Amino acid sequence: LALRYSHYLGTHADLMPGAEAFLRRLHGQMKIVLVSNGDSVIQRNRLFRCVFTPLLDNIVISSEKGVSKPDPRLIEIALAECGCTDKAEAVMVGDSATADIPAAVNAGIDSIFVDWKNMGYKQATYTAKNLAEVEQILLKS
């Protein structure tokens, strides 16, 4: 049953509305790295089927690195793999108040919390309600 469920998860993924267009607009203007705490097999299968995967400069999956968010080492691995030596140039965009934003804080980089549910989370450097607001913040930085 667990194997069937893992297979199902790996073959099904729902894109956030506007995510592909968002990444297409940013592609080439900055490096885009996906950092995931997900299971490697499931995430790789999803990304294999995903239309925006070619827009990513790198993919860092916790189960492949032996460390997961909010541990700052996963962010440091992502920065090193994409050649970012200046943390002031890095921004973590995420919607997890327990993994994404604490990982950014722990790694000493700016963060944008995508507050889909209007939770009012205050630990991030910036807060955005949607991808359009994320894009505005990124392009101003």
What do the predicted segments below correspond to?
Residues L1-R4, L55:
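Extended, well-ordered alpha-helical scaffold segments
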Residues L3-V33, P72:
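Short, acidic loop-to-helix structural element flanking the phosphoryl-transfer center
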